[in-house]
Regions:
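Structure-specific DNA junction-binding interface
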Residues: 1-88, 180-213
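C-terminal extensions
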Residues: 88-112, 126-213
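Conserved hydrophobic/aromatic packing and binding residues within compact polymer-binding modules
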Residues: 121-124
């Protein structure tokens, strides 16, 4: 999201004010993190994918941060990076539209996506019953959604920002944020579940936790 070679003067951690630091987002739990390069003069470009769970990872995790901790540039980059993550994991997000279930008698998980009301919900449910959606374009055409990628981006950003949401479809709410919430949130973790299932069944779906700058 943002890479500051000379450090971040506004950072709450003193050691980040004079050393290189990057603000990144995970592509499974959508956790916002600050990381430091392990090697000098590491070249990190916008939207680079950095492997975290490998021995030779070029960065080390320093801390979990909140949306409010992001720099102005990181906030500006966030929608573009999220859109890339969604498109890179398109089959997994299509599965969300195919398998999302009711949360209560009156609320369906799909209704948490901005722009999905009762009428659109019924259309999506009817269409996926006839035939599972095969792509986000298919969701748009048969499900009646306009720009589903942007709608997913908006939902993920809302989950990153909010202290009031009860249900988290994609973002894992970190411990510090949960402490600030009046009510304990419910993490549904659709993307995590689909990735795990794809690994267990050997399906050809994108997987593995990584970070995006």
């Amino acid at each position: 999201l943002d890479y500051m070679r000379s450090g971040n003067q506004m950072d709450k951690h003193a050691f980040h004010r004079t050393r290189p630091v990057a603000q990144v987002i995970g592509d499974t739990y959508f956790t916002l993190l600050e990381v430091s390069p392990k090697v000098p003069d590491l070249d990190i470009k916008p939207e680079d994918r950095l492997e975290l769970d490998v021995e030779n990872s070029p960065v080390k995790v320093d801390s979990v941060i909140s949306y409010e901790d992001l720099t102005a540039l990181a906030k500006d980059e966030l929608p573009k990076v999220l859109e890339k993550i969604i498109l890179d994991n398109e089959k997994l997000f299509v599965e969300f539209f195919n398998q999302a279930a009711p949360l209560t008698l009156k609320l369906h998980a799909l209704e948490l996506i901005p722009g999905v009301g009762k009428k659109t919900l019924r259309q999506i449910l009817d269409e996926r019953k006839k035939k599972p959606f095969e792509s986000l374009k298919d969701v748009e055409e048969r499900g009646g959604l306009k720009a589903p990628v942007k709608m997913l981006v908006e939902r993920i950003i809302r989950e990153l920002q909010s202290l009031e949401e009860k249900y988290f479809l994609f973002v894992y709410p970190d411990e510090q944020r949960v402490k600030k919430m009046a009510e304990k949130p419910v993490y549904l973790g659709y993307l995590e579940k689909f990735k795990l299932r794809s690994h267990e069944t050997g399906a050809t779906l994108p997987g593995g936790e990584a970070l995006r700058r």
